[in-house]
Amino acid sequence: MEKLNQTNLLLRFTLEIAALISLGVYAWISFNGYFKYVLTLVLPIAVMIVWSVFAVPHDPSRSGQTVIAVNGVTRLVIELLIFAMAVAALYFSYLKPVSIVFLCLIILHYIISAERIKWLLNQ
């Protein structure tokens, strides 16, 4: 069970990084001129800040520390919105097959993370 948990944490980390990259790719493909460069950097950084600042206190999948404490449902909604934006970003970047694979990996992660989801919903 511990090995599965470590593998899922690696999958989660990979999905988080891929989500940030996908937002940057979307900005690069979708915008021109000055905005192309600014948004390619700003979008992933803004999402990274939201992801790291809003957390549930004592979350076992994180350090347990937080800057802005939120309840579990709010945290779950933030995660799902970020992943949904990443899937949409890939889709609208003309990477439909990649967006489908990414969505399947996100679903797999949340299926494996059923205990964490239960924990979040009870916070």
Swiss-Prot record:
Q: Name one GO cellular component term.
A: plasma membrane
Q: Which organism is it from?
A: Bacillus subtilis (strain 168)
User: What family does the Swiss-Prot or TrEMBL record give for this protein?
Assistant: To E.coli YhgE.
- The protein's gene is named yrdB
Membrane topology type: Multi-pass membrane protein
Q: Which UniProt keywords apply?
A: Cell membrane, Membrane, Transmembrane, Transmembrane helix
Q: Which chain regions cross the lipid bilayer?
A: 9-31, 38-56, 67-91, 98-114
UniProt name for this protein? Uncharacterized protein YrdB
Which Pfam families does the UniProt entry name for this protein? DUF2568 (PF10823)
Q: Enumerate the subcellular locations listed in this protein's record, separating them with semicolons.
A: Cell membrane
| N-terminal signal peptide | none
Q: At the top level of its lineage, which domain of life is listed?
A: Bacteria
